[in-house]
Amino acid sequence: MIQQETRMKVADNSGAREVLVIKVLGGSGRRYANIGDIVVATVKDATPGGVVKKGQVVKAVVVRTKRGVRRTDGSYIRFDENACVIIRDDKSPRGTRIFGPVARELREKDFMKIVSLAPEVI
């Protein structure tokens, strides 16, 4: 469960390494975000020469969570870390590569570009 003040790893090559969640988008007073949800975050750690800089406010989609998600067939999928991908306003990723696996639930939420760039879809 991703909420305000959660620090997440960035799973793309946009230049950010770690972000801190400012707000979970979608509804008034929404508390938690899960896989496929969009959050507003600030960059806490960045690589030199990247597209995004430290302190910049960005939108990101959650691609991996430690809590995981329940599928319709009753199975659960969970990951070792909380990770996100930084996106533009049109839901396209800012980076050109995605690192690590992503969940299949992103396909249902119309993040097709992220799914196609990911090395593995679980």
UniProtKB/Swiss-Prot annotation:
One of its GO terms (biological process) is translation. One of its GO terms (molecular function) is structural constituent of ribosome. GO terms for cellular component: cytosolic large ribosomal subunit. Pfam families: Ribosomal_L14. Keywords: Ribonucleoprotein, Ribosomal protein, RNA-binding, rRNA-binding. The keyword Ribosomal protein applies. SMART domains: Ribosomal_L14. InterPro entries: Ribosomal_uL14 (IPR000218), Ribosomal_uL14_bac-type (IPR005745), Ribosomal_uL14_CS (IPR019972), Ribosomal_uL14_sf (IPR036853). Gene3D superfamilies: Ribosomal protein L14. Belongs to the universal ribosomal protein uL14 family. Binds to 23S rRNA. Forms part of two intersubunit bridges in the 70S ribosome. HAMAP family: Ribosomal_uL14. Part of the 50S ribosomal subunit. Forms a cluster with proteins L3 and L19. In the 70S ribosome, L14 and L19 interact and together make contacts with the 16S rRNA in bridges B5 and B8. This is Large ribosomal subunit protein uL14.
